[in-house]
Amino acid sequence: MDFTLDKYRELLTALKLHRDFKLRHDVDLRPDFSLRIAHIEAEMDLQATYYFRVVPESYDKEIIQQIVSMGHTAGYHYECLTTCNGNMEAAYEDFLHNLDKLRKVTPINTACAHGSPKSRWNSQDIWNHYDIHALGIDYEPMLDTDFYTTLYLTDTGRRWDGYRVSVRDKVPNHQERWEQEGLTFHTTDDIIHALSNIDHPIHHYSLLIYTHPQRWMPFGMGWLKEASLQSLKNIAKRIIVCTKY
């Protein structure tokens, strides 16, 4: 059974065979689910970065502090161009305001954009006009990662090959090359099996692992609901991708 807490533990165990990896989490919803994942990682002596949106369904001061207290770090999951309807100046001010709000809770030196698949705007485009690093942000994954040496794996769409239907959560200039090298995975078990094979090309790369903690839960009604919802969302995103491109 995929996307359960037990399966996540199995993934972490397999990742330890690789050694060169970073764990990143987009806290789009349900920060309490992120807290649960943070506990699992801490129990396994692993540290991760949790990117929080500054919206009621993600931002929770107490949970952020609890996660950081375990040795994890927090980042800002920004969506300023979407919330400001494409107004670049307003988006920049919105970014500054929310960054300041988060920094009153915990140090923040990393940020990544929320995908917002239904939005006309890609919030990452703000950095075509402003300098994110001048704001004390040392690392923006899509701007500061060398994807020639780092493999990006994300569970977007509740699958590990969700880039096929994703609007923005992908690395366009590298995805085809990774496919040619056999570095595409559909299930978590696919990744675990690759990590368990020392000769697999996955071991030629550093790994950047991105998950959405609200997708990982014990099997039950919540799991079934999430699986069904993501299937419908993937159909909608595929339509958007086909329409746009």
Where would I find each of the regions flagged by the language model?
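Terminal accessory/targeting
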Residues: M1-R24, D28-T49, S58-Y59, V68-M70, ...
